[in-house]
Amino acid sequence: AHGMLGYTVQVPRSGGRLLNALKWDERVDPENWQPIETLFQRAAAAGINVTHVAAKRYENSGFTRAVFRGAQYKGANLVADLISETKLALHKAPSFVYLYVNDLDTAGHSDGVGSEKWIAALSMIDQMVSQLMKEVPKGTRIWVTSDHGMINVQEKIVIGLDNPLMQGVSVVAGEPRARHLYLDSDSPTARAETASLWQEYLQDKALVLTREQAISSNLFGSEVSADALDRMGEVIAIA
């Protein structure tokens, strides 16, 4: 229902313009794009002091406004400051603090899981959590989680514009893990033929579905909003 379908998606009726969810686009209103009340807003309405602690550069980003609104933002770039802001926020009981650190994710995307950079980032986070456990108020529960898993990919598939797979495809969006293909024609025949062509080429490297197949498989939840349907690719290739 929230309509956040991938790293990049095509903005409906924009002439093929893509919205990068992390970099955003000032022409797109975050609260209109993602109108559903957030968990932070619901918690705040219930009387819980909600704080979002993360790097200063994320504070007014479109993604933050779309997904994390409802929390008081505390920007901090150094580990010591992240811990300090978290500790201060937890003294306002009842409280919930969402602390985001992107170092491990960045290292994994750039250098791979298990790389020296990744191990260093993991060690830093381990030390940070250990320090947090010593400094937060007694009785505080700490959950350590991640927004997604990560594996190292051995093969890179690059499809050029002159590739037969691109016939009838006007825009490619999404991300390497799941591509949204927007077609010149939104006919059932075009969707089925494109999905079949891509599946034959990719074989067991990906699962290629038409929009209808993805929806019927509940890949986007049991209820798909009109906005989500409007933004979804006619064909979706999932690694």
Whereabouts are the PLM-identified features?
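Feature captures the catalytic ectodomains and active-site-proximal regions of enzymes
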Residues: A1-A239
